[in-house]
Amino acid sequence: MNRPMKLFGVAVAAIMAVESVAVASTDGHRLETAKWQAAIDAASAAGGGVVEIPAGDHPTGMLRLKSNVELRLQEGARLVASGDPADYKPVKMHGSTEFRAVVAGVSVTNVAVTGKGEIFGNAWAFDYARRSQPKPSGVLFIDCRMVRLDDFTLRDAAGWGVDIKKCEDMVIRRVKVDSHAGVCTDGIDIEGRNILIEDCDVDSGDDAICVKSHDVGYPVENIVVRGCSARSHCNAFKIGTATHGVIRNVSFVHCRAFAARRVYRDLAPMPKDLLNSRPVKGAPWYLCGPGFGCINVECVDGGLVENIVVDDIEMEGYRSPIFIRGGDRRGFNDSHADTSQGRWFTLRNVVVSNVRGKADGRTPSTVTGAGRCRPCNIVLKDIDLEIPGEGENRKPYSWPGDDKAGAYPQTTLFDSYHLPAYGLFVDKADGVRMDNVKFRLRSGTTDSRPAICEK
């Protein structure tokens, strides 16, 4: 018998395994949405159960999980997403915002997606030249409790891979995400409370593992990312960019980050083979260059980001190892602010320690503020990074001021500037402390800048 576990001190009941609801497989070429949805509904109505997807391809539109149901993908099973947006009934959040996914749960409790099978998002069937066309996520949970995601593979989602919104008491373990349809194909995006992400392997075209806050009134807190591997063309481990409310008590520990394995060169001519998980002959693959940032902690939308721990990170293949940014993007509603409590436009209490590896770009790590947000109480400890020197560059030093407070917060912000350090640049930040921080020039390279510059 499974025992309840405790996650962040909150008791989380283990999902109860009862009699499976058996569903016969079809030929794998016509949509099976209605059949699988009926099985899910029947299991929930019976008080709970396990719906098993057998080996083989199973084309489907959007499936809605119900309370007390586990969707189990047997080894060799593949849910193949329909390429027709009409097969995804939108889920509304915040009144009008619509979301779609291959597998979704909305306001349900005690649910799971498990097994050694695969969810194939069929991204190439969607028209990326039409940005207005809906792009369904792979897995979506909104306003749910006691959710477990274990062991399955999610490949080539049209939108975000795993999208978690306002969920609590959740475990994501040993999930593999391999998704490279282009921009906005994040691996795992989290907005919730009491969540553990452990031993996952994420390879994504956009940000790999990301914690966000869209709702001023909903604190995002108590999130642990542990033992994960991240590959990204953009950013590996990230808090932001959406930072409208509170994000607190988040840790990334014992993780590795490397550059993404693959990405598409052109988002327009997509192969449209419903059942083929690999691009058709002639599809424009190419190996991408380094990712943008490995460790990214941001507060740019007027929120509060605090008590962040990043520890024991091995990295290679990113232009900027550490990017900590306070900003002031347009669109913040000042009527929401509670400046008397020091809550808004605040980025504080961040500890980054035991980071080692090799950078793959000439933009240094940065701790910077702009506009109404200055990072405060930032600790960098036991950091050992190899940096490729830029040589004897006589270009005058320059860096962005408050005129860039609303710029998109990632290391590309500094591309048109010549920062005055090759290892770490600190500007408009308070209480930045360093202990045993080493930036070593790569063998055979030089750099006329100092390793560290604090303004």
Write out the residue ranges for each language-model feature:
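Bacterial N-terminal signal peptides that target proteins for export
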Residues: 1-11
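Bacterial N-terminal signal peptides
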Residues: 9-19
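Extracellular/periplasmic carbohydrate-active domains that bind, remodel
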Residues: 20-455
